Amino acid sequence: DHGPSQDLEHKVFDANLHPHGILELTTTHEYRMAHAVINLLGNLEAGGAPDRLMALRILRDEVLHSARTPFRYNTGRVLIQIMKEIIRSRQDELTQLKLVHDFRKVTSGNPRLVRQFLNTYHLLEMPEEWNQLTVDHHVHDANTKGRKNATHLIMDAWIKGIRYITVVYYNYVEPAAARELLQAAEIMGVDVRIGLEFRTPFRDRFVCFVWAPRGFSDPEAFLSFLAERPMVALMNEGRKASLWMQRHVMDTLQLWNAKHAPALAEELEIPVPFLEPEAFLAYVGTGQTSFLHLAEYAHKTLLKHLVQRVKALQEEALTATSERQS
């Protein structure tokens, strides 16, 4: 398991200390890399944006600057992926021990071993010059309908070998969210663009389009652009549009409770729980409420009842007459 780092560990793993400096006197290279990944994953869940960015910078330094292999980029990608699997397996000690053994082997940077684990985790080998043309031009973070904050999103893009990415926000983007995304991308060497998705009436229906401003030299230039008066006015209008959409989604939730849930319960002969608005908003978290969130939440609350109903029907089928089975 992992949690907040201790004060002593914060001092030892100071981002201002170079991996080839005094850190080499404190502990082993493997331990520092493992700690860097755990520190980042812990901050992804509980830390603020500055903590996440600091943890990402420390991880980048440990993975790339202290690597003792010419295969450092691919080695780093595999190591982070293995550590993510270790965290996910926290309830299975045997699996964790096997993964720790794999982590220890990969830290050697042996190209044959690294390629083996790239294949295991379905990751493509990338050139060590890091000049591949890999793109993903429409992804979302936790500020819209995604589940990953900006730092987590960039880290996963780097693991997959993506160098060019467009992160799309609905109607507006908060400067703090843009700052974290741009700084995380700068740390990991990912070329990121921010897109704004708008919906507009067209021939009696809505169409969506994405506007991705370009031509900025660094993150501060884009943030200055967001602070300009016309952009501030546009973002305020975007917030109003998002509030309208939230009300529309919540009205649909009430319609589900009043009409569709009882009808589905009668048809499927299972209890269909009502959706609590407060619980639904807590499920959405920092994102913007959407019909995708509502569909996922309704499915989540309904799934266990569907599974129980299927099991009951399977048990009944074992003893039922042929007429009943048909």
Where are these regions (language model features)?
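Non-catalytic, alpha-helical, charged scaffold/linker segments
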Residues: 3-6, 15, 20, 24, ...
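An N-terminally biased module of ancient metal coordination in phosphate/nucleic-acid-related enzymes
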Residues: 1-206, 213-219, 224-226, 326
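Hydrophobic, aliphatic-enriched repeat segments that assemble into extended interaction scaffolds
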Residues: 186, 191-213, 242-260, 289-291
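Noncatalytic linker/hinge segments flanking ATPase motor cores
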Residues: 173-182, 209, 235-239, 252-255
